[in-house]
Amino acid sequence: MVMNAPKIEEILPEFLEFCEGAVMVAHNAEFDTSFIINKAEKIGINVDTTIIDTVLLAQFLMPNLHNYKLDTLTKHLNVVLESHHRAVDDAAATADIFVKMIKMLYDRDIPDVDKLNEEGKMDENAIKKLHQYHCIILASSEQGRINLYRLISASHLQYFSRFPKIPKSLVNKYREGLIIGSACEAGELFRAMVNGRSEAEIARIVSFYDYLEVQPIGNNRFMIEKDDYYVKNEEDLRDLNRRIIALGEKFSKPVVATCDVHFLNPEDEIYRRIIMAGKGFDDADNQAPLYLHTTEEMLHEFDYLGSDKAYEIVVENTNKILNMCEDIIPVRPDKRPPVIENSDQMLRTICENRALELYGNPLPEIVKERLDRELNSIISNGYSVMYIIAQKLVWKSNDDGYLVGSRGSVGSSFAATMAGITEVNPLSPHYLCPKCYYNEFDSEDVKKFAGGAGCDMPDKICPRCGHKLNKMGFDIPFETFLGFKGNKEPDIDLNFSNEYQSKAHSFTEVIFGKGQTFKAGTIGTVAEKTAYGYVFNYFKDKSEKEGRPIVKRRCEIERIAEGCVDIRRTTGQHPGGIVVLPIGDEIHSFTPVQHPANDCTTSIVTTHFDYHSIDHNLLKLDILGHLDPTMIRMLQDLTGIDPLEIPLDSKEVMSLFKDTSALGITPADIGGCKLGALGIPEFGTDFAMQMLIDTKPQYFSDLVRIAGLSHGTDVWLGNAQVLIKEGKATISTAICTRDDIMIYLIQKGIESETAFTIMEKVRKGKGLTEEQETIMREHDVPDWYIWSCKKIKYMFPKAHAAAYVMMAWRVAYCKVFYPLAYYCAYFSIRANAFDYEKMAMGRDKLEYFIDDYKNKKSLGTITNTEEDELKDMRIVQDMYVYAERLLLI
């Protein structure tokens, strides 16, 4: 068709003469006009004309289109396009589109190009739609690190469109301390050369970069196989590298040989191939050798340049860039807690006032000593602000009608109890008169319950005024929370009602000010099962595509899958973590920020780094959502009972954990379940109820121990369970919570700091050192105890268990004394899979489905939904004792 057409040298001057004084219009003009300008330069003609790009113009006039391809615009504007990608038809369609756009411009009172340029200045949305290039940004100084984080944040928050982007103008704004490299084949310079841009344009591009990059031929070999590039063979690729080197020499820019590393070793490409296939890439099998080359390998890759030039770009210039960089680390090493003015005195005043209100003036010596010791440690180590923040959050929730449950070891702090942060009183069991402040801490009656719970003690009348004494204390050492020297990093975790959690999060902004709090970011990685699925499906799809069987043994699939495990998959947010930025600091000195999972529809902003990476810098508040406070709020509304007034020594409630008598039913009525604990938080699962049956709890403190056992990892199964069955330990002597270890070892005469260190090591699953074992044996610690310590993988603190059992007990109390209110609250809040037709049509029909689901469970064919339904069915069966059937809706 063009065989006999004039050569470019003949026709181009005529074409440019024809265009003289006119405005050129093109669709994706940057690409098309680059060829004209390039060819014109080669024959000595300078092209200086105004160009309008219908892509950019359409983005300005019609910003809501999903793309701006020529065929998309023709359909949108009802323009005829008969043979797309045929030059004449495309040009005609572009002209028709432009004519319609001219009318749209006049409608907007834009009569000329000058006004168009003024009105069409780039905003964030327009920038998002621009063609993008890769570049390398290195931080060469501390200021550069901060500027880099500013750019990363902007790329995720302002300019994200399918992936993060940043305009060059923003790079220039924050250029201090940054070194900019021209990157790979997807970089602006390489693309300009491949697309035949003019020398002037290439010179402009080069001027932006601090150094230029060339890469091994194998990295870009794919260009030879594609028709999109005017690259015919490897020599063309070498010529492109030679041109980049020549540009570096011409413009005094160092040229560096880089690898564009995506994996470490050559054989690791299989992992990238599988991950890309799992994400739907059609060309996943065409992997370039993007591994980390050695210096010798890189010198060999560039030997076509001669040994001197190869050494210069591989070794000398690489080190030149390195020497431009200071020694910096990605995260700041210093701790920057938030500041609340007068927090030290504020905490001391709140705690002392509450202690005087509760225990009277003067305070009992044991109370005063504990409170003073804690406050001195908390304040001297700079943790008072953490307490005040928690106090403000809890008090606000309480004022709004919701209890807050404590998590972790904060309940071991008496100061936290006095500040109203936790309900757990960690003092040793004691009697206290609420009327005249009479107290007993060291009587023989009290000493019998050392290590237990005050609520387990028998009732007693005040010998001074005749009022019934309160029974208090869980006997938890403060050192579990802060260490003996205040050298343990404390963490205050709180369980707010799931209905109230978002309000608690918002209240942190009230405390610290707008822009000072961020959601704690997380990084989601490829899990083991997901990786296995990727590998399995990869070979399955490959087999179907190639029409031949590809058989891989399970062990081979697992081996390959192991290389895909823990690869970053997505980002997210901690369910309750709030990171607090001190006033006066900039978040970018610690971390970039972004939307979780790059969801631009949400207003939530998270830390870009996983919060663990910066938890030594910034305070993270754990403001979690939990169902217990929500359920207790509903029970309070239904019954009028103040949950704080519910006694923790009810024999009827305690009996739920031993049999079904308090409910007036038999195990036969509820499918053979021997206990009344169904539907009680922490104790209603088959696993927990079997623990109750095995341990036979008699006291509230036994329930705390059982909760510790059930929450831990390798604490009960294959450990305490075995020891109790063998008669080596009881529920009272087995290791149930981390505190047990430290207290027991100190009682054995081991130095307190050593006991604390052993506890910390064991509770994290790190076992015991030989030296620690020797110390324990020297102090007559039995072998079974040492064996138990070495089996433990993770242990919860006693304060955590106590707080959870207190919440569970209140629910259990309502199950015994206010059953209909209990079931109403349970099915409103805790039921996950309630099915009216299966569960509310009579006991016979219900039990038919229960038997059916239990049979499926034994055969391993039950689905997750059916598993959830079965849990709810068992509570409904429980409820049928109190009502013949649910009222028909």
Question: Residues of each region from the PLM?
Answer:
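Metal-dependent phosphoesterase signature
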Residues: M1-L12
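Phosphodiester-processing cores and adjacent nucleic acid-binding clamps
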Residues: M3-A5, E17-C19, H27-E30, S34-R569, ...
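Noncatalytic, beta-rich nucleic-acid-contacting surfaces in large DNA/RNA-processing enzymes
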Residues: D282-D283, P338, N342-I889
